Design a protein with these regions (language model features):
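PRPP-associated nucleotide enzymes
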Residues: 1-285
Length: 285
């Protein structure tokens, strides 16, 4: 088997190659003046490939499809660490496409692995050659292990809403730390406050965990809130560091101590590699 690195996941693919002791094939990329993308697999393939490519941008989606086509004579295993368009997993308004389904059904492969996909219903949209189901891997444990090594003082792991509770619970378990969730509590007919559901935060180091940080607006509000309620330090951690627009500035302006993320999207904050997780996932047959 050879590993084909897409343009958005070159460093991660290199790490996976080392983890599984597999050759990394040379892939050439370029963009024409009119915006069209070109790629070429410059090495010979041996019948089985592992393509690793996050689909952060539209160009990334096209590059993934081009890689699949270029390797179509092989048994194709694909890892999409960050699966773009996953948030459009249903029709929210009449006339909208289910974009997650559109992208999933365009992927012609034998096996597909995603990492902490926005909604696991997306897995049902893949129509794989082998008739297998796409697999969703969770990076909660490796993120929790990394956070435990940061030696926080009285750590408390917080979910910014009910939607991230399972991820936060699993992360906290790996950290051997308490966890809680922010909830809205009505104190009068006109006033609603947001606070942790069960655990007092005064004097604790708080880590807010979510699957994704995009614009940073939700996280920024939570940081300010926890600071005002007596947290000693507030850190944020996520699987997918989209970090669009001025997200970093917004988070640091709100008082965050650090931004910690995995390399499903390769950013400066990507200090946790999912390469070992991918190695484990590939053993699932």
């Amino acid at each position: 088997m050879k590993i084909l690195a897409g343009p958005s996941s070159q460093l991660l693919a290199s790490k996976v190659a080392k983890e599984i002791k597999c050759d990394l094939a040379l892939v050439e990329f370029k963009k024409f003046p009119d915006g069209e993308l070109y790629l070429r697999i410059a090495d010979e393939l041996d019948g089985e490939v592992l393509i690793i490519q996050s689909t952060v941008t539209n160009d990334d989606v096209i590059s993934l499809l081009q890689l699949i086509d270029a390797a179509s004579d092989c048994y194709v295993r694909i890892v999409v660490p960050y699966f773009g368009y996953a948030r459009q997993d249903k029709q929210f308004k009449p006339g909208e496409p289910v974009s997650a389904r559109v992208i999933a059904q365009s992927i012609d492969a034998d096996e597909v692995f995603l990492i902490n996909v926005h909604d696991t219903s997306t897995l049902d949209h893949f129509k794989l050659r082998t008739r297998r189901k796409a697999i969703n891997l969770s990076a909660a444990r490796i993120m929790g292990n990394h956070l435990r090594g940061m030696h926080f003082e009285s750590p408390l792991v917080i979910s910014p809403d009910e939607g991230a509770v399972q991820l936060v619970r699993d992360t906290a378990e790996a950290m051997k730390a308490e966890f809680d969730v922010l909830v809205k509590k009505r104190v009068s007919s006109e006033q609603v406050i947001i606070q942790p559901k069960n655990v007092a935060i005064d004097g604790k180091d708080v880590v807010i965990v979510d699957d994704m940080i995009s614009t940073g607006g939700t996280m920024a509000g939570a940081i300010k809130l926890l600071r005002s309620q007596g947290a000693r330090e507030v850190h944020v951690a996520c699987i997918h560091p989209v970090l669009s627009q001025n997200a970093r500035l917004l988070l640091y302006h709100s008082g965050v101590e650090s931004i910690i993320a995995t390399d499903t999207i390769e950013r400066a904050e990507s200090v946790i590699s999912v390469a070992p997780l991918i190695k484990e996932g590939l053993q699932i047959r």
